[in-house]
């Protein structure tokens, strides 16, 4: 289906030169150490092999190989299935897998001795295996994951990716997930691509010329969808507080994953000239673009463009993404650089957490000793907003005051074994349904007081007592 005549043609040198000029002219997205190969550049005389089964696809694979897997909505399910079947049929050992969250079936964690997974951001299909010691988790900032590959801390033998069919110039697109994948394909010895006619074509850093691929495997597959959960009354209230008090017209938005960021977006329909520079976005951004609230007109970097590194959501957002010149999908090392984030006007970073203690320490990746997610870009964007060049950035942690079981999320101490993702020095604004606590520059006694004021009323008295026991002084605003 995809073996078109152009796959066997030789490109004239003017086309090659123009492609290279276009690449270097677009390097506003560049923020990395150069790898041994540049996916934008055609490799003269090289043509990938088309495979029709696992034996043809993975015949070069050996024991102990390091394998990267494209994640998120672009998870290549066909290649995952065929990799598993090939390794098991050949009895290969010690295949090490590296990825951020993947979606869909993930059989590797039940094949001890054959595979070992390392999650650089944990998804639902790996949590149980990590907790049981059958898989691993690496705590790392999303912006620094590319350095694992570029500095050769992890020597990748193979990258499995999901791409669009090549265009008339021979370029494929990584679709909705550029994130850390660009660094992986720059540094992998072999690249195996699932060529997928249902993947949205994206721009920015998303391109790879087919001559950089080792193997192409046709595999039509819809993007993995994540339907947003409707916001609760509490989450809706938090969204309203943030939208009305902390987001100004002309602000540049970063929103994380979840009901609270979605609730904030739903309350911004009357705002004007908002911009988006975010590690990820979902369906909520589409509505604001369609209503004219998001124009990106005042952004200092890539004005007029929605900038992101990956997208999750439903068919609605993938249709919006497809071949849309308004959206640039870029290398996460650049997108999430605090130095880059700080250059945009009024950057607002909206993130959530699992719990926060009375001094401002934030746990986001774990529930006690149980690994739940990862560092992601929370610290990257909180820091970028905090040091914004215009002095108008707002780094926000938004969290309901209690769990579904009425347990307070503002706690005297983080749960035993819980990891600190965002330090108390990073935290400026904390928002619950009861209001806003501003912690920047406040001492521990003042922080405890501010956080207790936005805790659930049922827990404020006990938190005051616990704060006194911990700090040896009563919480006070002065």
From Swiss-Prot:
Catalytic activity, as annotated: succinyl-CoA + acetate = succinate + acetyl-CoA; propanoyl-CoA + succinate = propanoate + succinyl-CoA
Keywords recorded for this protein, A-Z: Mitochondrion, Transferase, Transit peptide
UniProt: CoA binding residues: 256-260, 354, 377, 404
Coiled-coil residue spans: none
Pfam families documented for this protein: AcetylCoA_hyd_C (PF13336), AcetylCoA_hydro (PF02550)
Cell compartment(s), UniProt: Mitochondrion
GO terms for cellular component: mitochondrion
MF terms (GO), sorted A to Z: acetate CoA-transferase activity; acetyl-CoA hydrolase activity; propionyl-CoA:succinate CoA-transferase activity
Catalytic-site annotation from UniProt: 279 (5-glutamyl coenzyme a thioester intermediate)
EC number assigned by the record: 2.8.3.18, 2.8.3.27
Alphabetical GO biological process terms: acetate metabolic process
UniProt transit peptide range: 1-30
Chief localisation class: mitochondrion
Family: Belongs to the acetyl-CoA hydrolase/transferase family.
Job of this protein: Transferase involved in anaerobic fumarate-respiration in the mitochondria. Catalyzes the transfer of the CoA moiety of acetyl-CoA or propionyl-CoA to succinate, thereby forming acetate and propionate, respectively. Acetate and propionate are the two major metabolic end products in the anaerobic mitochondrial metabolism of F.hepatica. Also displays CoA transferase activities from acetyl-CoA to propionate, acetate and butyrate.
The protein, known as: Succinyl-CoA:acetate/propanoyl-CoA:succinate CoA transferase
Organism listed in the record: Fasciola hepatica
């Amino acid at each position: 289906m995809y073996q078109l005549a152009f796959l066997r043609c030789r490109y004239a040198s003017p086309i090659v030169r123009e492609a290279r000029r276009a690449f270097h002219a677009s390097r506003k997205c560049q923020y990395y150490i150069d790898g041994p190969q540049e996916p934008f550049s055609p490799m003269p005389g090289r043509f990938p092999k088309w495979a029709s089964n696992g034996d043809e696809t993975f015949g070069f694979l050996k024991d102990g190989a390091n394998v990267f897997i494209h994640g998120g909505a672009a998870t290549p399910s066909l290649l995952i299935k065929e990799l598993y079947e090939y390794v098991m049929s050949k009895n290969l050992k010690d295949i090490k897998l590296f990825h951020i969250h993947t979606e869909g079936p993930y059989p590797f964690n039940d094949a001890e001795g054959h595979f070992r997974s390392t999650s650089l951001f944990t998804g639902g299909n790996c949590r149980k295996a990590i907790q049981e010691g059958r898989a691993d988790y690496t705590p790392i900032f999303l912006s620094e994951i590319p350095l694992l590959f570029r500095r050769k801390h992890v020597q990748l033998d193979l990258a499995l990716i999901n791409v669009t069919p090549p265009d008339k110039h021979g370029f494929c697109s990584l679709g909705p997930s550029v994130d850390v994948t660009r660094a992986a394909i720059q540094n992998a010895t072999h690249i195996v691509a699932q060529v997928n006619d249902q993947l949205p074509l994206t721009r920015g850093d998303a391109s790879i010329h087919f001559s950089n691929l080792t193997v192409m495997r046709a595999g039509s597959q819809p993007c993995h969808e994540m339907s947003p959960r409707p916001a609760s009354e509490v989450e809706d209230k938090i969204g309203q507080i943030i939208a009305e008090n902390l987001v100004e017209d002309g602000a540049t938005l970063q929103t994380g994953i979840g009901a609270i960021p979605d609730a904030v977006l739903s309350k911004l329909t009357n705002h004007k000239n908002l911009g988006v520079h975010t590690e990820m976005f979902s369906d909520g951004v589409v509505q604001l673009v369609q209503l004219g609230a998001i124009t990106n007109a005042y952004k200092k970097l890539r004005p007029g463009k929605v900038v992101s590194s990956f997208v999750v959501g439903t068919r609605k957002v993938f249709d919006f993404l497809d071949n849309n010149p308004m959206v640039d999908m870029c290398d996460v090392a650049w997108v999430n650089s605090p130095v880059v984030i700080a250059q945009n006007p009024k950057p607002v970073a909206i993130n959530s957490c699992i719990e926060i203690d009375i001094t401002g320490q934030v746990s986001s990746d774990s529930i006690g000793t149980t690994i739940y997610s990862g560092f992601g870009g929370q610290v990257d964007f909180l820091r970028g907003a905090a040091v914004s060049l215009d002095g108008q950035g707002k780094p926000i942690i938004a969290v309901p005051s209690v769990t579904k079981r009425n347990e307070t999320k503002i706690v005297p101490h983080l749960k035993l074994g819980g990891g600190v993702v965002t330090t108390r020095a990073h935290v400026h604004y904390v928002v619950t349904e009861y209001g806003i606590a501003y912690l920047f520059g406040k001492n521990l006694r003042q922080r405890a007081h501010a956080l207790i004021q936005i805790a659930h009323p049922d827990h404020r008295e006990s938190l005051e007592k616990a704060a006194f026991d911990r700090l040896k002084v009563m919480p006070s605003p002065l």
